[in-house]
Amino acid sequence: MSLSRLIIHQFRNINSATLDFNPKINVVVGPNGSGKTALLEAIYFLGLGRSFRTHLTSRVVEHESKSFTLFSEIQNNNGSIPIGLQKSKSGETLLKINGSYCKKLANLTQYLPLQLITPEGYTLLSGSPKNRRAFLDWGVFYHDPIFYPNWSRIKRLLKQRNAALKQCKTYNELQIWDNELCILSEEISQQREAYFELLMPLVKQTLADFLPDFSITSQFFCGWDKNNKSLQDYLFDNFYRDKQIGYTSAGPQKADLRFKINGIPVSDVLSRGQLKLFVYALRLAQGLFLNSFDNKQCVFLIDDFSSELDQNKQQILAKHIINSNAQIFISVIAAENIDRLFGQEQTVFHVEHGKITVE
């Protein structure tokens, strides 16, 4: 899957643009505030139905306009799929996929598997477990078709259980939720762990180039110590504690990935630049996995490619990007090193004051 064409109207400071993309590497060049990140944001919106910069649609729509419109053509093994998306400042949404209107923006995710890497991306490792669960679940979603309906059901059960915790007086009143919750939680955890075990060899291959001086260990934590007791036992034993805090304290919603160097979390050992390289290794490995195991092409959005990376690391990273068999969109402030890094593989777009031209 790759994005072959994008038409933009009234998105951020981009009033109008029609762009045909390289199936491999696309470099977006422009000074800060020019609109290069807005271009990546528009692509992200088409892939996930939301922005990575704000949750307010009004901030994405061009200042004096009422709505923005995005139209794209996505190439897959069966040909071209047209997708159109319009959102207004008032929140109204129109989505059309392959000629049919769709009500759910979540339907977009299956057509354009997107990975976003920003200068703040190191929070995947230094931030909360929620970030690492999202990373893991992105891969499981595309690898195992049963995962998404199972996880959606678990989230509904947890919402109902947490509401019931505030009302019930004995654990028996929660059994109606916990019986199904425990079965689905075991399935979800097995799906996550199986994917993680397949992914990590690809991560370690990339880390050998990116961070050769460090020996990094990895561990999947399912959300409870299943070697000690079952989730059913945890929920029973923690009933009064959970009732006091008002939510369920064990289960797949508490899962995490743990990366350590000599027993110490990587976020306490590595610099920000090194953490960024680690994140690149994780994301690129997911792209390789998607291509090798699931026969799908990943689309990478890399904002501020050279941030906190010396020329040697940029060269190593560029080599892995070229070999990733993914479609890449990279934003940079200056283009002087682009040919050195990517040769003739790329198409270069220049952005200034929201106007986009092709080199």
Swiss-Prot record:
This is DNA replication and repair protein RecF. The gene is recF. It is found in: Cytoplasm. Belongs to the RecF family. Pfam families: SMC_N. GO terms for cellular component: cytoplasm. The lineage of its organism: Bacteria, Pseudomonadati, Pseudomonadota, Gammaproteobacteria, Alteromonadales. GO terms for molecular function: ATP binding; single-stranded DNA binding. The RecF protein is involved in DNA metabolism; it is required for DNA replication and normal SOS inducibility. RecF binds preferentially to single-stranded, linear DNA. It also seems to bind ATP. ATP binds at residues 30-37. It comes from the Bacteria. GO terms for biological process: DNA replication; DNA synthesis involved in DNA repair; double-strand break repair; SOS response. HAMAP family: RecF. The keyword Isomerase does not apply. NCBIfam families: recf. Keywords: ATP-binding, Cytoplasm, DNA damage, DNA repair, DNA replication, DNA-binding, Nucleotide-binding, SOS response. SUPFAM superfamilies: P-loop containing nucleoside triphosphate hydrolases.
